[in-house]
Amino acid sequence: MQFLYRSLLLALAVVSLTSCGTYTELIGTWTKPEYMNKGYKKVLVFAVGTKSLVNQSVAERAVAIRIAKTGTVAVPASDVFPLATYDANKDGKIDDPTIADKLAAKLKVDGYEAVLIFGVKDIKEQQRYVPGTVTYQPTSYYNGWSNYWATTYQTVETPGYYTTDVEAYVEANMFDVQTSDLVWSAQTEILNPGSLSDAADSFAGTIVPSIINNGLVSTK
């Protein structure tokens, strides 16, 4: 997954030159029936698969801010579990094999009720051709048929060009801290992310309403 995040950053550099705006589509969601309207009051937001604390923080904060607007306490994992605590050399491998159990225990002690984990699952780049256009502009010359014929239409031509579309597939899962049950899951497609910040904001604006609509966070 670390490779996917590096690929996404490279793709962002390409698409930012031609992007018309970031768009996130919610491909599918699932909610465990018995957890609907659970109304979690404290949630940890965890972005996985990135070696950069900055990138992790940007993604987590975008989602946490959206959730916090409902009245739920939403905390970025990078504030609680810095990358250095489990992958000090940033090699994509967990240093302490018991860290998962330690994190789970700490979440319970600190009063977290749910943890939302998300990460990039796949990235695709597609090149497409945008056809040129020809616009005809009528003129107002009526000085005889020849002049009219010669200048009846002026044309404005825009040449065609190639552009690259970037599609990033991001999966999000919410777990109950006490039972470890998967309570909600979503698959999304982010189209042409102009920047990491744009992608994070677009992603957050798409998944958080689904979480709210299923009653998984408390509301004011």
How would you describe each model-predicted region?
Residues 1-8:
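Bacterial N-terminal signal peptides that target proteins for export
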Residues 16-19:
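C-terminal motif of bacterial Sec signal peptides marking the signal peptidase cleavage site
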Residues 21-41, 50, 129, 146-220:
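C-terminal/domain-edge helix-coil "capping" segments
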Residues 42, 50-125:
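N-terminal segment of the mature soluble domain
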Residues 95-174:
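Surface-exposed short loop/turn segments
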